[in-house]
Design a protein with these regions (language model features):
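Solvent-exposed interaction patches of small proteins and small membrane subunits
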Residues: 1-54
Length: 54
């Protein structure tokens, strides 16, 4: 893998990590289920895109 490709993957993983942390915070703050599910859907989509790239 090239360095550019590695950085791209790292950026995507960092974004996914941020979404997961946001979901944890939402659960702690007892946010609406619909909002949490929307974030989980975004995480799933990001993971699928990452898998296709890899």
């Amino acid at each position: 893998m090239s360095r550019h490709y590695d950085k791209s993957l790292d950026n995507r993983l960092a974004a996914i990590e941020g979404h997961v942390r946001a979901v944890r915070q939402m659960l702690t703050e007892d946010k609406e289920c619909e909002d949490i599910l929307l974030q989980l859907s975004a995480i799933q989509g990001s993971l699928e895109k990452l898998g296709k790239i890899i």
